[in-house]
């Protein structure tokens, strides 16, 4: 690293497996304290960073004081992805009133007593939604009260916005970042916004956020053409992005292959998409297809009631058994016409709209749909209700098997294989259609920007998936830190700690990756 191998100190709160650590270590950061309450995540952290992390922040920062396991030196940068579950769309929304939500105040105790020079806090997108307006303003007010210059507008960013040379990965993962710089005490009256009555003004915007979802960057280093993530020619392509690599060893602790019934569901919907494409010359439209709504037509309902649909047969295909479509549909099984049902006008508008489009679709294609449902046994126990739904968001992808899919409670969602939706800490692992398998734990680690040498040991694959779903993206953190230092450079120059941070973080171009580091520091 240039500039005399500049270094700065940081503490890593709610550290997980070390996403913040990976980003900061790549720019000269030296971790002095890390804390993570999850035993499995803390073990992975220590395995890779040679730094004990297992512990409870409430033991180290509370009303009695701040100990940080004996570290009493300067803190140049404080990072923390404080617990997201109360705010996340992936789970029930209960807000900061939940016990773990109050852990922000343990962060605040460290900030109050130790006065880190720079703060980088991360949370889910919902933190800045209308349901959490009070919590957001409380956080901003607290930081300003402690003497920090912080934007009142959130920095919202996602790794798919960055081209690969800047550390981007093909994953839409919108996260909120709160970045702040400690203002020298003599300057606080002019830098910290206050109301006319002299109180801290939490609603004032202050400096601009360091990143937004509208930011765009050059496709190539030094170039002028901008990178657009969804562009068909120059945007992301999951299959050629480097996330999926030929020759990767097969993981020993997880079977990535699809089950027979999972393959059946995809084969069936793939057949319907192909059937409609042949009939119309167009792919499916982009709305949710609900097979159960078609049974509102009395002609199809009668066939379901009399158990006219049977499960398809299984045959050996390659080295595995696979369901194959039936070819024995009785003559006259398909009705000559269908009767459109009325829509209950008391239903929510969105549901009426979906039903109307499904009824239109079935009226136009009932002959093809009934024959399709017979071939695959769609109205049998092989298809639970959630698998009788398809959310086609793949535009003109040639086949369902050419998409990236997710099995969700709302149905099978299909997207073009450009970039993936956010990894989550629950069981919605992406299915890569062209490979007929799920993403591997190693591939999810690449999506989060972790280096190839990063080692999860022999832990359960489910634990790795969970950790990746809870983690921060390394490239995004590095970008956020760099942009923060650029924005606040004049303020940081005023202190020795700030100068250390500038010299380290701005020493190298953003393509200097953590992969050059060894696991030991």
Swiss-Prot record:
GO molecular function: DNA (cytosine-5-)-methyltransferase activity; DNA binding
Disulfide bond sites: none
Top-level taxon of origin: Bacteria
Positions of the catalytic residues: 84
Gene3D superfamilies found in the cross-reference section: DNA Methylase, subunit A, domain 2 (3.90.120.10), Vaccinia Virus protein VP39 (3.40.50.150)
DNA repair found in the keyword field: no
GO annotation, biological process: DNA restriction-modification system; methylation
Root EC class: transferase
This protein's UniProt keywords: DNA-binding, Methyltransferase, Restriction system, S-adenosyl-L-methionine, Transferase
Occurrences of domain SAM-dependent MTase C5-type (ranges): 8-491
InterPro entries, per the entry: C5-MTase, C5_DNA_meth_AS, C5_MeTfrase, SAM-dependent_MTases_sf
The enzyme's E.C. designation: 2.1.1.37
Catalytic activity: a 2'-deoxycytidine in DNA + S-adenosyl-L-methionine = a 5-methyl-2'-deoxycytidine in DNA + S-adenosyl-L-homocysteine + H(+)
Domain notes: Replacement of residues 191-272 by a single Ser residue still protects DNA against digestion by AluI.
Record-stated family: Belongs to the class I-like SAM-binding methyltransferase superfamily. C5-methyltransferase family.
Name assigned to this protein: Type II methyltransferase M.AluI
Species annotation: Cellulosimicrobium cellulans
Gene: aluIM
